Design a protein with these regions (language model features):
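Membrane-helix interface segments
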Residues: 11-16, 43, 79, 115
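Transmembrane alpha-helix detector for multi-pass membrane proteins
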Residues: 46-66, 92, 96-104, 132-139
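Selective detector of the "anchor" transmembrane alpha-helix that sits immediately C-terminal
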Residues: 1-10
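Hydrophobic transmembrane alpha-helices and their membrane-interface caps
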Residues: 15-68, 125
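Pore- and gate-forming transmembrane helices of large, multi-pass membrane proteins
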Residues: 19, 76-111, 121, 127, ...
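Terminal, Lys/Arg-rich, intrinsically disordered segments and adjacent short helical elements
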Residues: 69-88, 92, 139-159
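Hydrophobic alpha-helical transmembrane segments of membrane transport and translocation systems
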Residues: 111-159
Length: 159
């Protein structure tokens, strides 16, 4: 909750709402896959889930920061176009970061022993889901809520 308050102040309440729904998506999908794989939830899984939340939130904040930066820099384009451009600009960074993290976590999975396998498996699932949500869920949700429920003081008023 403290992180969502930070995002709401740093960016906007719609950014916070989009990121919270994306984080909820990440945790629930990861838990669902762990349930399907019959992996027991223990302290290492809880630690992995918290790591996933931090990792996914970091990815989302990078995208949101680029959106905010481009909103100030690019005048005249539609908000939807600016969000799309921002996602395209951060896509390379997001994919490369996720790929390199997956390499390290894969080493943990294969060589870490039985204790670290469930932790590493949870991270692998969570990184894939978190990367997906930071690109395809958080920003579109932010845009949707901004368009559907605009803040009254920011609506253009006709004279």
């Amino acid at each position: 909750n403290l992180i969502s308050i930070y995002i709401a102040f740093r960016f906007d309440r719609y950014y916070a709402l989009g990121s919270l729904i994306a984080l909820l998506h990440d945790v629930l999908i990861t838990l669902g896959i762990l349930s399907i794989l019959n992996i027991e939830i223990g302290i290492s899984i809880i630690a992995a889930l918290l790591t996933i939340v931090g990792y996914s939130l970091n990815d989302t904040i990078v995208v949101y920061d680029r959106i905010r930066e481009n909103m100030l820099k690019i005048i005249g384009d539609k908000k939807r176009t600016i969000i799309n451009r921002s996602l395209n600009e951060t896509l390379n960074r997001t994919v490369i970061t996720s790929f390199t993290t997956m390499l390290v976590v894969s080493v943990l999975f294969f060589y870490g022993g039985s204790v670290l396998q469930s932790f590493a498996m949870t991270l692998i699932i969570g990184i894939v889901i978190g990367t997906y949500s930071s690109i395809y869920i958080a920003s579109p949700l932010m845009y949707y809520f901004e368009e559907k429920y605009p803040i009254p003081e920011f609506i253009d008023k006709e004279v």
